[in-house]
């Protein structure tokens, strides 16, 4: 897997499925594809005075990931961890919600063997900007979108999800993802199945699909957890 794929991915895995809520939200998950993995743990904390889904929120994020790519010394194995903190503003209505956030992200990447020409290498601190939201389309259909950009590694990440609430507490749909940076780009499409039982404060989402990328096309799979607090 090219290093730019995961540079773009960690620009924005901080999904906000409850950005319109007054409660806080804990998030955790993992994704695996050919020659790469990604795991994360995050928290979204409402700011003071937030009411009816309108107001400030804070996002905190920790993640660990690995990937392989063909670099200057040959095949390179990368392992990294990252942390970020951001401040955002959200709003909501009867038909959906939206938010915008900005903050700092630190990533520490170890390469074996070392690749001095790599964009992602060592400790790097940069800005991260993100927009996201959801909108009801009617007839139990809901459209969600996320777009983000990370300055230091010049990475972008965007995802579109179309979900149908077929029964109480269950949704099925499709997702489309595009990400990359100056060095490479990738696209992916997959199926998403989400479960959030009525009157419960937790949710679980399963994802699977196929990714097209510069060096290693193949399937991917993932799982996401969310819990209000």
Language-model-derived ranges and their functions:
Residues 41-46, 85-88, 191-193:
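Short, well-ordered amphipathic alpha-helices
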Residues 200-201, 206-214, 221-228:
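Long terminal segments
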Residues 128, 191-195, 216-229:
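Outer-membrane beta-barrel "beta-signal"
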Residues 1-25, 229:
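Cleavable N-terminal export/targeting peptides
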Residues 32-33, 56-155, 174-180, 208-210, ...:
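Outer-membrane pore/translocation modules
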Residues 155-188, 198:
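Intrinsically disordered, low-complexity segments enriched in Gly and acidic/Ser/Thr residues
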Residues 20-72, 220, 226-228:
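Short glycine/proline- and aromatic-enriched beta-strand/turn motifs that initiate or cap beta-hairpins
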Residues 20-23, 47-58, 92-98, 136-142, ...:
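Short loop/turn motifs that connect adjacent beta-strands in outer-membrane beta-barrel proteins
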